[in-house]
A protein has these predicted regions:
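Alpha-helical segment proximal to the catalytic Tyr-Lys
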Residues: 150, 169, 194-198, 262
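Short, small/polar-rich loop/turn modules that mediate ligand/substrate recognition or access, typified
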Residues: 197, 202, 239, 264-266
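Residue(s) in the substrate-gating loop at a strand-loop-helix junction
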Residues: 165
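Active-site helix of classical SDR
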Residues: 145, 181, 189
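Substrate-binding pocket helix/loop in short-chain dehydrogenase/reductase
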Residues: 118-122, 126-134, 234
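Short C-terminal tail/terminal secondary-structure segment
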Residues: 114, 119, 170, 242, ...
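Canonical Rossmann dinucleotide-binding motif of NAD(H)/NADP(H)-dependent dehydrogenases/reductases
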Residues: 2-39, 43-44
């Protein structure tokens, strides 16, 4: 960071999960000198998604644990609870960041809801299940951005990073709601980037591919009795020969959040080991 630059403040949603992308981004930004506000709908993430990879989750402290870890590393850090799909909560999370640290420079919209496995076939998808995925993944991104743009405009500087998915760049069978929501995140990112381009605010999306997180581990466990073999099968389908890590995604976020990324906006960057090359 330039010696004349203020301390940048980042708000990152979806930070309650073990092996999650959110905590990895918080570590990366905190390690780069940013103050960090970590957020989630509950201290350990959304209860219906809280399927951790066995013993690896032992001792996981959720949001409080992330704060303790970053604070011990010398990072100014705080946590806030809120549901991104609720208008009042979105505004309150942004207000909390501004009141706690005096400003908000970086917003990372990482909170997401998967499509429930039992609703894979379109004839079986209830409207409320479809709506929930769109409410969190797309409407939540909109609400958080809408709340954050005001403080960023007032400062004349901002970085918005929306976590989409490789599913937002192609089609995923039996994942209509999730795929539609992640395509929507990319479209919204591109539109918003034009709206705020003259305000010193950049807006970009990151599209992770197969990434070793607790959610992917749980998916592999459901798909096969041999979890390691299933994870290896998925890795073998990736050109670089391995699953991504949360840190791979965090490295991309670190660039988009940086001072040097000011001429890059409206982009959707795949972090997928070379799977999508469009």
């Amino acid at each position: 960071m330039d010696d004349n630059s203020p301390e940048r403040v980042a708000l990152i949603t979806g930070c309650g999960k073990h092996l999650g992308i959110g905590p990895a981004i918080a570590r990366a930004l905190g390690g780069d000198g940013k103050a960090v506000v970590v957020a989630d709908v509950a201290p350990a993430g959304a209860p219906n998604l809280n399927q951790q990879p066995g013993d690896m989750a032992a001792g996981w402290g959720g949001l409080p644990g992330v704060v303790d870890e970053l604070t011990a590393a010398g990072v100014r850090c705080a946590a806030v609870l809120g549901d991104v799909s609720r208008e009042d909560d979105a505004r309150a999370m942004v207000d909390f960041a501004v009141k706690t640290f005096g400003r908000l420079d970086i917003l990372v919209n990482n909170a997401a809801a998967p499509q429930a496995r039992e609703f894979n076939d379109i004839e079986d998808v209830p409207l409320d299940a479809w709506q929930h995925v769109l409410d969190v993944n797309l409407t939540g991104t909109f609400l958080m951005c809408r709340a954050a743009v005001g403080p960023m405009r007032a400062q004349g500087w901002g970085r918005i990073i929306n976590i989409s998915s490789i599913a937002g760049r192609t089609g995923s069978a039996r994942q209509g709601a999730y795929t539609a929501s992640k395509h929507g995140v990319i479209g919204f990112t591109r539109s918003l980037s034009r709206d705020v381009a003259r305000d010193g605010i950049t807006v970009n999306a990151i599209c992770p591919g197969g990434t070793y997180t607790s959610r992917v581990f749980s998916s592999a466990r459901r798909s096969s009795g041999d979890i390691e073999a299933e994870l290896q099968r998925r890795a073998d389908a990736i050109p670089v020969g391995r699953l991504g890590t949360a840190e791979d995604v965090a490295n991309a976020a670190l660039y988009f959040a940086s001072e040097s990324s000011g001429y890059v906006t409206g982009q959707a960057q795949s972090v997928d080991g070379g799977v999508y090359q469009g």
